[in-house]
Structure formats: structure tokens, C-alpha cells
Amino acid sequence: LTHEYKDAPEMRQLMREYQDQLRDIGLNGLGLLPPIPHSSGHKFVGTETCGKCHKTAFEIWEGTPHAHATASIVSPPEDPGYVARHFDPECISCHVTGWNPQEYYPYASGYLSLEQSGHLTGNGCENCHGPGAEHSAAEEEGSNISEEARIALRNAMKLPLEKAREKCMTCHDLDNSPDFHEPD
């Protein structure tokens, strides 16, 4: 249903019970794949790390719904009766950093919980650009990496425009974002 229809209290209660079960079972108990390495072989560091160098991009991101994606499933301010969904893999996969959004499993070093990996809240830079641990380490003063390797890591983080739509659609699909329209 659309947002024009109010949730029935009985359905909210069922959803609350379901979310409580997900919390109690935990990700391991759900039979999900164990966290697997990202196809790049790199690890996630979180958007704050990206923002140390990419200050303007970070400031813009902070003002977007992507920055508040996790908060929106924990407790959206406009709905005090909302049922938190931050234990639900189908929600987590697009509302945090470091999950496969189509197959609902975390990558190794990806988000696991607010307590364990709070630095990976929000739909961060790395969901589209790839895990940034090696790139950010290479950019640190005193790193022992060659300039050629540093440039290769930079290039690997670039998201060509033609690939951006594909990345967007992994979360903004018809099931989750039927009203999503690409900017002109």
C-alpha cells in the first residue's frame, strides 16, 4: 500500500513482533551467508574516513537522505509509532554501508549492527565507489605505496556515469522505490 493509507494497529503489532524476532535471532541465526569478502578484496572504512580528504563531497552527502538512511529505519522523526527495521536484512541491505543490496548479506568488514559497526551507518560512499580501506591508506602521509599503485587505487574508486544508474537501481528498484526517478 502507499503512504496515503494508515497502518492498522494490528499490523504494526505483528510487524513489531516480527522485528523483535529478527533482533533476537540475529544475523547469524537467520541462515544468511556469512559475511564474504567484497569482490574487490578491499575492506570498508566508512564515510567519515572518505570525508577526511573529500570534504566537499562529504558535506554534500551529510545533507542527503543517504546520510540518514540508517536513522530512517531505526526511528524516523515524523512517525512516533514506527516499527524499527534495523534488524531486517531486506532493509539493512540498502540503509547501511557494506551489504549486497540484492542478495541481503553483509560483506566482510561491512555493517553488522549499530553497536559493532556504527561507522558504517548511512548509505555511504563505499556502497557505490567500493570499499575504501586500501585507497585511504595509500593516501596517508608516509605510506610506502608507489605513485603508480596509488593512481590505480584512485581509478578503481571512480564511478563512471554509465555505471551510476546500475548502482542506484540496486536499491532504488520497483520493489523498494517505485517513485524513484533518475535526475535529468
Which residues does each PLM region occupy?
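Non-transmembrane alpha-helical segments in soluble domains
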Residues: 126, 168-169
